[in-house]
Amino acid sequence: GNGIVYRNRISDGFSGKLYTVNKEGGLSEVVPLPEGGFCSYSSDGKQLAYNRVMREFRTWKYYKGGMADDIWVYNPEKKSVENITNNEAQDIFPMWIGDEIYFLSDRDYTMNLFVYNTKTKQISKVTNFTEYDVKFPSSFGNTIVFENGGYIYKMDAASKKPEKVNVTLASDNVYARSEIKDGSKYITSASLSPKGERMVVTARGEVFNIPVDKGVTKNITRTPGAHERDAQWSPDGKHIAYISDATGETELYLQDSEGGEPTQLTKNNDTYIRTFQWSPDSKKIVYTDRKNRINLLDVSNKQLTTISQSLLGEARNVSFSPDNNWLTYSRVSDNNFSIVYVYDIAGKKEYPVTDKWYESYSPVFSTDGKYLVFTSARDFNPTYSQTEWNHVYNNMGGVYLALLSKDTASPFMETDAEVAIESTPAKADASKKDETKNEASTPVVKIDIEGITDRIVKLPLPGSNYYDLYSDGTNVYYFTKGGMKMFDLKKQKEETVSDAAMMVDPAGKKAVFFKDDQLFVTDIPKGKANLSKPVNLANMKITVDYTKEWAQIFDEAWRAFRDGFYLENMHGKDWKAIKEKYAALLPYVKTRLDLNYIIGEMIGELGVGHAYVNPGEVESPKRVSMGLLGAEVSRDKSGFFRLEKILPGASWSKELRSPLTEPGVEAKAGEYIVAIDGVPTNSVNDMYKLLIGKANVPTE
């Protein structure tokens, strides 16, 4: 009863080993086993029942693969180990009481307590829970306690009858209290009004209408129990559209830019809406969903048309042509390469712009209607490996222009110089002034499909990855290594715009940049952007109601698996019933860790690996760094500490160096550490006490 056994991965980054340490402190001693997890000593301390693997904190259920655990008994005197369960199911948490070893097993599907008799070597089932797993048992003396369905049970090992324990905790539930958060720390999207005076910003599931210069910041949704996202201002400035799951499904909503109640545009949606885009005339919205559909919505009458659905994958970067008559997008082909398409809305037909032998994606029409700008991986410039006989094809991406009309010349074609002849322009007919202005502001996009794959030209840029494309027909903007760049098609010169990504307003006049939790709005830059004046986000305050927010997160997690799981039959599970089973525990959730645990248990029911829960905002203490020496150490009878083995390192590498082999240290195995920073090591029972907080700190 004077020792503590624990698991540590200090000697192996993957497999944990078991160590023992005196309860009063001192150097730890390794248990001579290759690996270890949950364990329990026999009452005489001469044998150890243990697991080899420790993965109970992962969201895996019903696993029967190579990492499924067994209970092993280690006898140090005989230097032997024995597998006492030898079962394909998960057998974990051994608890040695007298002549019996209790443990958890899901050999009958639901995790229950079983017991192994060390005399008869027989296993019998102890508990018979069928709805929730028995979790995290622990023993003291002859009593075992465990959790099931949120309740604590205790069981006497002699009677083997579990009893529910009535527990009352006096708690203020401080982590479940509502609080006000700074919304600027949670921004997920931003969209400018047509002239750039205001912007609509989504943050932590809320939609804000914010002045770019001066004015009032408005939270136009105020729905802590719903997840609003991807809000976009309509090009005519009259409305704001956004996605919300207020009904329990993701739907599109429309709100007047001046305020008022939102209008639900879509109803009875059956899957997750990915993204959407306004048409330039503000009359239609195109959106994609998890069923790989492209949907066209008439905003005025809410008429919905599915124009495309693919079994191969989703359509990405769907957007309109400037004259509202075409769509463009990319989608994978049968060889798993992405192809760029244009879609004739009136003719109801799609046409490939690129062929299937080059990965092509992120298409967007230039605002003058002349080009389709996209990225493509067709820059074959292999790098020869310095460590093996091989070539690597990376940095294959480039920016390309498809010349939509056969009458459009390549911007890189050399032209002959012409003599400029002055002429007196005819006086414009005032009656046709407005008509001419409107025609000029909305270019007609002419696409000659025949031969379009041969009318593709490349910007003279190095192979790299390119994102966030935009073009006004004269300049092409893109994000790549080093930030946002602009290529001037006339000067044929690249300029650096900013180290932040850029988004453009519907009118093509203003741009918004996001950098270091700040938003900046400028005129569309023709060179280096001036990001000296950030938008005032100080009034983006969000009242977080954790109870409602956690319920929404739970529901969205359930829908994410419903819509995104690789098999529609959910491995034969009743996914709706599973949701109800774990939703019953939501009223008892008082921390984000509670929520994560419930979601993890729910998705674990699918019996699939590597499906984990993002922890989100959880309270965690600051870790204290520990200085380590890269050596095995023992304590001498003198009280000082002896270097038994020094691990070699690479002194030229900060990550791989070994402190005691640094040039100038000259420590050797067999030598003693007699003091650390002047403190004699024989004055402490564990010299590592003197290395607390000493990681990467000069120490002598």
Where are these regions (language model features)?
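Blade-terminus and WD-like Trp-Asp/Gly-His loop motifs, strongest in beta-propeller folds
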Residues: 1-3, 39-47, 93-100, 136-141, ...
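Conserved blade-ending motifs and adjacent loop-strand segments that build the rim/top face
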Residues: 124-138, 351-362, 460-467, 495-504
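Conserved PDZ fold ligand-binding element
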Residues: 657, 661-685
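PDZ/PDZ-like peptide-tail recognition elements
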Residues: 609-655
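A flexible loop/linker signature enriched in serine peptidases of the S9 family
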Residues: 1-23, 27-39, 43-72, 76-92, ...
